[in-house]
Amino acid sequence: MAVRARPRFEIRRMRADDLDEVMEIERAAFRHPWSAELFRRELEHDWSTILICIEPLTSAAGGRASERIAGFLIYWLVHDEVHILNVATDPQHRRRGIAKFLMSETERRALQAGATLMTLEVRRSNVAALELYRTFDYRAVGVRPNYYVDEGEDAIVMVKELRRFR
């Protein structure tokens, strides 16, 4: 059966059976990746959400054959604040708007849940991520020295205030 990719992507919550594919992306994206156990714990917490961006694959006959995970985003919702913990895109899907799609969906869900603030930390050296967050109107508000203890790198603390439109 021939399989071809559809040009659109979808977002859904991660399930336990997605873990192997998500771990492949995590290992490809980071020098010091999270462990599978950390992902399992995030799946168990009520306040934690792991969104995955999937690329549906169709058969030559036009039916849905399977899906491939293109990226993921992990966030916590605590009271009226969303904290983004981890964002990664599969190297084969980079520069295709996957992270932007995940960020937009996270913000939509944050607003729907009544959140008023979004926060995150990012490596000072991660220029691509800093640019992405700035396009979403995040602003730097501080530095956490040696936050990334693996290499002694500082984290830039960024925030975005959410405004509801009525």
Question: PLM ranges: what are they?
Answer:
Residues 46-47, 80, 126, 148-154:
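Short acidic/glycine-enriched loop/turn segments that link adjacent beta-strands
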Residues 2-9, 13-94, 103-113, 161-165:
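Acetyl-CoA-dependent GNAT
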Residues 86, 90-104, 108-113, 117, ...:
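Conserved glycine-rich acetyl-CoA-binding loop
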Residues 39, 129, 144:
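Acidic, amphipathic alpha-helical patches
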Residues 20, 37, 130-131, 149:
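Alpha-helical elements of the RecA-like P-loop NTPase motor core of helicases
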Residues 119-121, 134, 139-157:
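Conserved catalytic-core motifs of GNAT/GCN5-like acyltransferases
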Residues 100, 153-162:
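Accessory recognition modules or surfaces
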